[in-house]
Amino acid sequence: MTVEELKKKKIAVLMGGLSAEREVSLNSGKAVLASLVRQGFQAVGIDVGRDLPQRLAEEKAEVAFIALHGRFGEDGSVQGLLELMGIPYTGSGVLASALAIDKIASKVIFASAGLTLAPYQVLRRGEEFKLANPLPVVVKPSREGSSVGVGIVRDPSRMQAALDEAFRYDSEILIEGFIDGREVQVGILDGKALGAIEIVPKGEFYDYEAKYTDGGAQHILPARLPEAVYGEVLRQGEKAHAALGCDCYSRVDFLVTETGDCFLLEVNTLPGMTDLSLLPEIAGGAGITFGELVLRILQAASLKI
């Protein structure tokens, strides 16, 4: 849609929600809403709950800018509702969203696309556990973001505690072989890589606190990689985005080893849009302001089914 068309429409910024990433989503939504209002759009914020259909109808929303993170927002649930209501929305559609948030399902797609993954095993609640990979390993819920419930296990005595923590958030969890490498994240806009940023967390890894605490991690843009490796991680980011059928934008996370191997971790279909978020920072490095980023995402709003 053109800017002129969009300025005639009522835009609902969906934020908050019911997931463990609620507070982050509120920050993303407030930043997006403020940007839209500054740019002259008729925008209103909606804190998403189970009354969302009623709220959308009350506000007479004609377009939805989704600034939700985690379950019931990033997993295809809200996208399906918007499809049913006929309200164009930003970001990826139902299927791509559902695949991306499910680390187990997405790994099957990534492997079939020839992308490099860390060795992993799946454990479901109630199953007998037998470790398939040598320590250290990374334990994580299958369907959470922002490193919620994630832990690194180096000592066998800490394994059960890590499993219990991950199972607090999901009935299925992943146990991945630990990859010693740089944390590199690729920003995608309109299906093309904008650049790659390197994350150097102050703690053991890039956990929730490091992501959302000012000074919790150092961001290096562009990532400190040899030219050939930098180009390869951008290509793999685009490939992962396309493999899931993502629409418009995403952030793709990698671990890059000293030998230049790029291990894909996940694709985030609704990356953070806060002051500390990586996609806006990567976009800024490509000469795209926050307002321009918001506008380009909004212009791509559509029904996908």
From Swiss-Prot:
Keywords: ATP-binding, Cell shape, Cell wall biogenesis/degradation, Cytoplasm, Ligase, Magnesium, Manganese, Metal-binding, Nucleotide-binding, Peptidoglycan synthesis. Pathway: Cell wall biogenesis; peptidoglycan biosynthesis. GO terms for biological process: cell wall organization; peptidoglycan biosynthetic process; regulation of cell shape. Mg(2+) 2 binds at residues 266, 268. Its main location: cytoplasm. Its EC number is 6.3.2.4. GO terms for molecular function: ATP binding; D-alanine-D-alanine ligase activity; metal ion binding. Its cofactor is Mg(2+); Mn(2+). Mg(2+) 1 binds at residues 253, 266. It comes from the Bacteria. GO terms for cellular component: cytoplasm. Pfam families: Dala_Dala_lig_C, Dala_Dala_lig_N. ATP binds at residues 134-185. The keyword Coiled coil does not apply. The keyword Ligase applies. Binds 2 magnesium or manganese ions per subunit. Residues 107-299 form the ATP-grasp domain. It is found in: Cytoplasm. It catalyses: 2 D-alanine + ATP = D-alanyl-D-alanine + ADP + phosphate + H(+). Cell wall formation. Belongs to the D-alanine--D-alanine ligase family. This is D-alanine--D-alanine ligase. It comes from Geobacter sp. (strain M21).
